[in-house]
A protein has these predicted regions:
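N-terminal loops that bind phosphate or other acidic moieties
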Residues: 1-407
Length: 407
């Protein structure tokens, strides 16, 4: 798993370049890489296979990013469930677990489509089963060769992939993951310097349709609740599309492309404890990637209280502050709008407060901007008024970037 995760992480940027499905927001590589990084950071290794896999699944479900990251997490969760209480696995048991895990990934998606990461998961596990009697290293090598063909064929499964002459980014990400596993089986090397980004096939510049439409907000919510996955799938369906719902223990992770994430949040708060949330403006992401007005991009935080129309017109990225209302953390102007805030002000049990964005949120925003632009200008209030400025500086320094960044 570690080797697979590291091999996927080093290919983050290449995956972003070919990301056009389900929307051309150019962040599939980043979302998968962040999911893998969190697994490496939070999962605990144990001598027993079931304990290790359970820890990996928990970290994945609770910290997955994006559509493909959520599907990947549910696949790992299914793998942990299928391993069950086994402390060690035979080759046959491993192959059976990988095959049975696929159904968990499919069931998490409200409208599963072929030609995506799901297809590669299914075909890879089927190929393992068909050649299960072979030596393990040979088995993996053969299955990966067939997985490559499956990935290549994704461009003929979905029109948007065919139109842009690219394979599905999520499917390619899963291929990098299983290639990393094979590298470790073959060499036994886990050192990070061993993993190199693959050479990507040159493509004519991808210019996809960048009109995202009304469902422009890629939204994720982690909810602690006793209610089951099916309940939340039915509850969330009216709010948007690209719905993925996964559950492990008492935690439900929800991914949805929504028009009004604040309404999704208001609904979920009534159903359990919302542990965390993430909202990305896919229209802005698509514009910055494919229709950027300037080589310089501007980033600020939601203290800069200017109209949304102005931010959209000038393609300004606004990092939301955290608003804490009755012990629940909201994203300023995204999962908590000013209209909703003031309408319910008299209903709050405690005085609302604010907090800086987390380091993980800052890293995610800055990584995407730095990748897309030639230069980045960050405009924030003074460090004496808010700690966000100093946190931004620390985050930029930790990224070791070579591009020009002005704060």
């Amino acid at each position: 798993i570690v080797s697979g995760a590291r091999n996927l992480i080093v290919n983050e940027h290449g995956l972003n370049k070919i990301n056009v499905f389900p929307v051309a927001d150019g962040d599939t590589g980043t979302n998968l890489a962040l999911t893998m990084k969190t697994i490496l950071k939070k999962a605990q290794k144990d001598d027993h296979t079931n304990t290790t896999m359970s820890s990996i699944a928990k970290a994945a479900i609770e910290n997955a990013y994006g559509n493909s990251g959520m599907i990947f997490a549910q696949y790992l969760n299914g793998l942990a469930i299928e391993i069950g209480s086994r402390t060690q696995l035979t080759q046959e048991e491993f192959v059976l677990a990988t095959q049975n895990a696929v159904k968990y990934a499919y069931e998490a998606v409200s409208s599963p489509k072929e030609g995506t990461i799901l297809t590669v998961m299914k075909e890879w596990s089927s190929d393992l089963k068909n050649h299960v009697s072979e030596e393990f290293e040979t088995l993996l090598e053969r299955s990966i060769e067939n997985a490559k063909k499956t990935v290549d064929n994704t461009k003929f499964k979905l029109k948007v992939l065919m139109d842009n002459n690219v394979v599905d980014a999520g499917a390619k990400g899963f291929l990098y993951f299983i290639e990393g596993i094979y590298q470790y089986v073959k060499t036994g090397i886990l050192d990070e310097s061993h993993f190199k980004a693959a050479t990507m096939e040159e493509h004519v510049e991808i210019i996809p349709n960048t009109d995202i439409g009304e469902l422009r907000y890629c939204s994720q919510f982690l909810v602690q609740t006793e209610k089951d996955k099916e309940y939340f799938t039915k509850l969330m369906t009216p709010f948007g599309d690209s719905l993925v719902v996964s559950k492990r223990d008492e935690y439900v992770q929800i991914h949805i492309h929504a028009k009004q994430p604040e309404k999704v949040m208001a609904t979920l708060v009534r159903e359990g404890i919302v542990i965390s949330s993430k909202v990305d403006d896919m229209q802005l992401q698509a514009n910055l990637l494919h229709r950027r007005k300037s080589p310089i991009v501007i980033v600020t935080d939601s203290i800069a209280d200017f109209p949304q129309e102005f931010a959209e017109r000038e393609q300004i990225t606004v990092i939301p502050l955290n608003l804490i209302v009755d012990s629940t953390v909201y994203l300023d102007k995204l999962t908590m709008t000013p209209e909703y805030f003031y309408k319910h002000l008299d209903d709050y049990r405690m005085n609302p407060t604010s907090a800086q964005p987390t380091q993980e949120h800052l890293e995610r925003y800055l990584t995407g901007l730095i990748e897309q632009a030639e230069s980045v200008i960050g405009i924030f209030v003074s460090s004496k008024m808010s700690g966000t400025f100093n946190n931004i500086v620390r985050n930029v320094n930790s990224l070791n970037v070579t591009k020009k960044i002005s704060l």
